[in-house]
């Protein structure tokens, strides 16, 4: 005779509202012996099998015809391992009862999760393969502290939320269930009854794999193995090393020519890595890879932060892409978006009926520019979710750095908001103190756990201390995009050369603040979309002048202090704006389409990268005044600039730019060292489709004072061109 389970309790199970399944289901001690109860909708019979002896112990009584079974095993006081033989009509199967297993969330994990200080919560939350009592399966865990009931649903249970309600850990707000026999590749979601009694179907925030849009389920996937940081990769990230970054959108770098569909990760690796290596870039930066629902966001509105997008294949494929880059000596950086997330119903929004991940007040929690939600950085569990994600990509995929998107929108409460549309911080200020602490903590965590990895900030304001260590009060980034330099110099280059003399300071102002941060000079995807034109399209003049302007600008940029970043397509001067739905215009490199104009720019970028890597004077002292000296800074009338770059061991290269279409012959300016100067680069070379004005290989200094220096050189500066002169000594 079974112990009475009230009809109301049984009804709660079939209505999907029972919040504590382990208090009823599984094995329980009663006065008459051990009682076993099972919830198996649509089953006709259930027999208990002893796992050790494989003998039938008893048949469960069909207490409720909808599928609730129970039986007492008389005179038995000791719990034992068992299986259930379940009959579905004439057919039967042996299953492991999920409700016979004890809680598996360790006390330490539970405590760390409860205070939001777990270093790697992705190792605990989500779906993880494990073995318990000799039974293999998947342990599912979800943080949803305000939900009334959570069930795991998926391919393994007909997506029926009645079948597998989960155990609730009150202290941490985590729901848990070990599901035997769940297997790799099966799809799943969490079914919640939220705090308002509404049913919600949510993807796993910690899923390691997700379905391709428009489908939204998570996919059971193994946690990737850790990839140790190597000394070679660590060295390539250092401040005194050459860093030239090729920014890539995987969905449009190159596509299948027959159907315009994406290449997969392995196909991309086979084509992209050799190309980047040949072009001389030291790093690749991928636009966001975390799973995202809307192609048009380019990945900047992610929902599956722990899932490499399935657009291009599997997580294993993405990992192979990174491995191939490392084999070629190329480091890999990932765009990372911890600033906001879309409001799709299967995602993080109103997760358990409350504003769990976001702010409840739209003045704090809604981003009006992007129609997205803003993370609540004041909540420990949310900070933990995000900072752990940074570690996940760096440790588990062997990435060498992250570039953090839209930092300014995170650290200012009034970002893009009018008066009255934002809430001041506790001191009445506009800074988002919680976001600032989150960034400091994340960068500290990266430095502590993945030594040698770098973080780069896209920060568009003059916020102080972005690249100052967090231990010294800064945000702790290693580099910052120099948005001011980019905006000023592009504004200058877009002007007709006749008017450039009136805007001369736009090319020099960057040196006023050059040593305030560690800078990357970015010509990114943002500059070639939304009607801004391509870089080539920004340049004034006829076709010859457009290409010459761009070549001169690249020469100036590669000589200027700061690491380099160039978005794909700009290395061969694509003429139209970037379109994420199509491949780059590679056909422009063919004679019949682009002539040799585009080949010339491509060859120049290749040579710039190799010269840059080969000469320490162009990178070693980017962050020190000892590495830079203006030689000609005030020649507005001729739009000429000249500066010297220096290395620690005394190597010197002079960079000279002429931003008018008039060649400047016999142009004299002072130099610091007497001797010969070899012309190692000329953007006007015929090799690059220029007019081939130059200095016949080298020039020598003369004891003729100029520009407050005792020695000077007299050079020919080609029209719309930059030349590099390397000091060779006397």
From Swiss-Prot:
Protein name according to UniProt: 1,4-alpha-glucan branching enzyme GlgB
Organism: Pasteurella multocida (strain Pm70)
Entry similarity comment: Belongs to the glycosyl hydrolase 13 family. GlgB subfamily.
Reaction catalysis annotation: Transfers a segment of a (1->4)-alpha-D-glucan chain to a primary hydroxy group in a similar glucan chain
Annotated HAMAP family: GlgB
E.C. number(s) listed in UniProt: 2.4.1.18
Quaternary state and interactors: Monomer.
SUPFAM superfamilies: (Trans)glycosidases (SSF51445), E set domains (SSF81296), Glycosyl hydrolase domain (SSF51011)
Annotated GO CC locations: cytosol
Enzyme class per UniProt: transferase
